[in-house]
A protein has these predicted regions:
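Structural recognition of the beta-strand scaffold that forms the well-ordered cores
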Residues: 54-59, 78-83, 103-106, 141-144, ...
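Soluble non-cytosolic domains of exported or imported proteins
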Residues: 62-67, 74, 102, 106-110, ...
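Short helix-loop-beta-strand segments that form the rim/entrance of peptidase-like active sites
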Residues: 97-99, 185-212, 232-235, 370
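Metal-dependent peptidase/peptidase-like ectodomains
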Residues: 1-6, 204-311, 315
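Extracellular/luminal Protease-associated
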Residues: 13-109, 167, 171, 184, ...
């Protein structure tokens, strides 16, 4: 709550501690200096800043939420609010719940500006963050083609879970349904030809709680199994009603790990771009923001690619001219909300993304990275 009585929203980060009952009342404080320092990623960010007992206000980007929390807590802050630097809300989580020290959440860019003004004026604000953390068990569902060359394994995946707040039709039921269709198509004779590769279809659990299912899958692969896994294709939110046609950006650096996609990822991106073009549509490289199941494969050095329809980010005017829809509005206005239901998703978007995915999956089911259009035989 601000001094004028307004109550801008805060999205609590996954695994964040809660504020005390009744909330936390304190002055917000921002790290001074350049853009890098305002991200609050390095211990020196708060040098000369009276952060003890205050609410740290930092910009998104530059490091993980864990790092932002650790640095702010080390400076004596009582909580951290991370302001988006673009349109939309901030939906985040902590990668290491055991290391969580102080409450942390995300706010929109506009709310960040309001809080910065409160800090400049020396006024206090009240922040209330409530979270529940429990230990639970979930499962991945893995389907493996009975035939195909195991020395050249192609993995495709989509997460099955949703956030507690919504039924998760676009995030991520539509993608899981398309993945299932791919598996059913592969079941009809795949593996009977000598050029066929082994196909694995991963329906991941606990993506919304830190990409846990896909990370577990990669972590439990033997060294030999990792070597055999030649590429990964990811499907995420492909039915967004105000959709974009995005491919995973093979030239981007992961904002948390600093890793770049493995060699071969650019070819996968190009194949997906060509598959959209074959439908008369232009795709664009999407945000490689570390928020989907490709991350575990990227971290293991496995070439990655994928399709994505957009979530809470706002569609630009240029994108609206390219794909239609409403500029300045989220790709999915029901992201992580109760309205994420079957009536909301775009069948057109699901078809475009699904066809592009199936085209590329079919190609790599019989080809290796770097091969042309002629199957091995």
């Amino acid at each position: 709550m601000l001094q004028d009585g307004s109550t801008p929203g805060v999205v609590v980060s996954g695994y964040s501690p809660s504020t005390p009952q009744g909330g936390l009342t304190a002055r917000p404080v921002t790290p001074g200096g350049d853009a890098e320092r305002r991200q609050g990623c390095r211990p020196g960010a708060y040098d000369g800043v009276p952060a003890t007992g205050r609410i740290a206000l930092v910009d998104a980007g530059g490091c993980s939420m864990d790092d932002k929390q650790r640095v702010a807590a080390g400076a004596g802050a009582a909580a951290v609010l991370v302001a988006n630097t673009g349109p939309g809300e901030m939906h985040t989580w902590l990668a290491d719940p055991a290391a969580a020290r102080i409450p942390i959440g995300g706010v929109t860019q506009e709310t960040g500006r309001l809080l910065a003004a409160e800090a400049q004026a020396g006024r206090t604000v009240q922040v209330t963050l409530r979270s529940l953390t429990e230990r639970r068990t979930t499962e991945n569902l893995i389907a493996v083609s009975p035939g195909g060359n195991p020395e050249h394994t192609v993995v495709s995946g989509a997460h099955l879970d949703s956030v507690p707040e919504g039924p998760g039709i676009n995030d991520n039921g539509v993608a899981a349904a398309v993945l299932l269709e791919g598996a059913l198509a592969a079941a009809k004779g795949h593996g009977t030809r000598p050029e066929d590769n082994r196909l694995v279809f991963g329906f991941w659990g606990a993506e919304e709680f830190g990409l846990l299912g896909s990370q577990h899958y990669v972590d439990t692969l033997s060294a030999e199994e990792r070597k055999r896994t030649k590429l990964y294709l990811n499907l995420e939110m492909i039915g967004s009603p105000n959709y974009g046609l995005f491919t995973l950006d093979s030239g981007a650096t992961d904002p948390v790990t600093g890793q770049r996609p493995a060699p071969g990822s650019a070819e996968i991106e190009r194949k997906l771009t060509e598959a959209f073009a074959a439908q008369g549509r232009k795709s664009l490289p999407g945000p490689a923001d570390g928020r989907s199941d490709y991350v575990a494969f990227l971290g293991a050095g496995i070439p990655t690619g994928g399709v994505y329809g957009g979530s809470f980010e706002a569609k630009t005017a240029e994108q609206a001219a390219l794909w239609g829809g409403a500029a300045g509005r989220p790709y999915d206005p029901c992201y992580h909300l109760t309205c994420d239901r079957t009536a909301q998703y775009s069948r057109e978007a699901a078809t475009l993304h699904g066809q592009a995915f199936q085209t590329v999956l079919t190609h790599y089911s019989r080809h290796r990275l770097g091969e042309g259009s002629t199957p091995r035989g």
